[in-house]
Amino acid sequence: MKWLRSLVIFDRGGVASSPDWEKIHESYVRSIESIDFPKGKGFLKLRRKTKKPDGKYKRNGVGYLKQRFLDHLIKVEHWRAEGGFKIEKSEIQTVVSLYPSLESYREPITSMFGDFDFVTTTPSGLHVAIEWETGNISSSHRSMNKLAIALETGEIQVGVLIVPSRDLYDHLTDRIGNIKELSGYLIMWQKLGLHVHKGLLVISVVEHDELTD
């Protein structure tokens, strides 16, 4: 699999210029580039999407890609899977106004975000979280929001979302989150960085090496 590019959405406190970030980026890019099919060939070959008799398209699944990324990131790079940094509800509960009284009100928080897909802590103490996209575009938005909130509260200092390129998206399970559909919202997440003391939010874009019929 190819790593195409990493988009720095915001960088507060110079994290992107640190040796820690350089090592973290190299680590997960190695795991991206370890994903191949057929296994052992050193490149990722996928079947082109094909139209079925019912008019729907047959596409490649996404579970294999995440599993291969997980295997390398955990076993070779020594990250942790399904890890979290605790965010207290009191840290994110905000005061709003009720209409028409305009009284101050705190809406109860009845659910939390769950664990990140992958986490690690650098020798200097930077907490890092990665989300690997396997869901639809709504899932991508939730992942970005979760990373942004964790950065704002200081629970993590680096947050990364890994998503398919538009070309890869065409040949994967229908409606998976991808960079093209996220691109119009980057300005919103960028502005959230103004509230972060120290933190780096990144989207990394990945793609297949080859297509076959």
Q: Language-model segments: which ranges?
A:
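Structural motif
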Residues: 126-128, 158
